């Protein structure tokens, strides 16, 4: 190799190193500015409750017993998705939503979250808020698994439950329905998990999430600007928290989760949590589902949805001797946003049963139609 070629290679490596350092410095600066802006943004829905050196956010409204606690699904958005549901439930009893550690307006967890840390956080939050039982727990998606785990841990405090298109620990979705990370080869997953702390520091996740949509219900337009800015920034924190939890639960990406919620630790804890006894229970199941253009994918998803409606969700309803499944015909998985009235109706039935005003949850024809119901 000639002298000139070696010099050219050395210069190229120097320039490459310079460019990489420049990009890293820009990313680090971008992330630090973002974190500073997060700290300066004071807008909040709810209130901070100290749970031992850190705070969790909770928002409550309404009066009466039992207290309804709303447990969110995944995605890093936190509890704000429950605003419309909360408004309806508050007309007949006390109702609260909260942000899990590392999501929404809550402080991060001291280490990677686990199923135990999530339910222990909620228990401590309710104690310090303070909010007295009995409780009716409402869980959407993988939040339904936390409802089951909490009930097993603190059975004397839970009087009833509503599972909203809840994750089943044994569900096995078609590969293309798995999260993008779980579709990757093992080496790629391990690389992502090992590189994630650096990606966080260099602002990569913040950059990818900068235009994430935030849905503010029409009746809450007065808070649109504050909520949009707050939750868009906070979802960065939420996604990072969920990724950290997922990597810890899969041995740094070595294990490929193809069942349940995609988090083996949470799924296993829900699986062994046991039954719900004779507590009033309603299982709401989405009647609609994603229909891709690819005919093979569409057929596999349709087959999975049939299993979902007729096997997996009925199994959840049989967790209680007083369980009932209701199919929400006009909604997909996002029932809190697309059919909040179905949740409010289900919660009202469970609340009445807990109060002893009816022995069983009210029988229905098996379906609830979303949209058009008056919650007044």
Predicted features by range, described:
Residues 319-376:
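Catalytic active-site module of serine/aspartate enzymes centered on a nucleophile-bearing elbow/loop
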Residues 14-29:
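Hydrophobic membrane-insertion alpha-helices, especially the h-region
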Residues 50, 54-105, 153:
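Conserved HGGG/HGGXW glycine-rich cap/lid loop of the alpha/beta-hydrolase fold
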Residues 70-72, 98-100, 164, 285, ...:
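Alpha/beta-hydrolase
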Residues 36-55:
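N-terminal cap/lid segment of alpha/beta-hydrolase-fold proteins
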């Amino acid at each position: 190799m000639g002298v000139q070629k070696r010099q050219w290679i050395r210069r190229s490596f120097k320039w490459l190193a310079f460019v990489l350092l420049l990009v890293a410095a820009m990313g680090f600066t971008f992330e630090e500015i973002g974190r500073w802006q997060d700290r300066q943004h004071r807008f909040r829905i709810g209130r901070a409750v100290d749970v031992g050196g850190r705070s969790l956010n909770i928002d409550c409204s309404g009066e009466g017993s039992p207290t309804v606690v709303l447990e969110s699904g995944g995605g890093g958005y936190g509890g704000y998705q429950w605003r419309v549901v909360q408004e309806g439930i508050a007309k007949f009893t006390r109702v609260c939503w909260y942000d899990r550690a590392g999501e929404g307006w809550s402080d991060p967890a001291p280490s990677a979250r686990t199923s135990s840390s999530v339910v222990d956080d909620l228990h401590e939050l309710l104690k310090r808020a303070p909010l007295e039982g009995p409780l009716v727990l409402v869980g959407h998606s993988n939040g339904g698994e936390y409802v089951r785990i909490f009930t097993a841990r603190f059975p004397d405090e839970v009087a009833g439950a509503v599972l909203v298109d809840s994750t089943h620990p044994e569900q096995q979705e078609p590969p293309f329905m798995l999260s993008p990370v779980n579709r990757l080869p093992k080496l790629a997953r391990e690389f992502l998990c090992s590189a994630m702390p650096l990606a966080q520091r260099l602002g990569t996740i913040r950059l990818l999430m900068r235009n994430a949509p935030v849905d503010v219900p029409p009746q809450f337009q007065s808070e649109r600007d504050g909520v949009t800015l707050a939750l868009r920034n906070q979802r960065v924190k939420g996604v990072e928290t969920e990724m950290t939890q997922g990597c810890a639960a899969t041995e740094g990406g070595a294990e490929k989760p193809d069942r349940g919620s995609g988090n083996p630790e949470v799924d296993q804890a829900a699986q062994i949590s046991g039954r719900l006894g004779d507590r009033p229970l309603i299982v709401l199941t989405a009647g609609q589902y994603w229909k891709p253009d690819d005919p093979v994918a569409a057929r596999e998803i349709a087959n999975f949805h049939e299993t979902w409606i007729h096997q997996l969700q009925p199994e959840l309803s049989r967790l209680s001797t007083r369980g009932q499944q209701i199919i929400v015909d006009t909604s997909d998985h996002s029932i809190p946003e697309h059919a909040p009235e179905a949740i409010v109706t289900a919660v009202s039935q469970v609340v009445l049963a807990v109060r002893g005003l009816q022995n069983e949850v009210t029988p229905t024809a098996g379906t609830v139609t979303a949209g058009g119901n008056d919650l007044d």
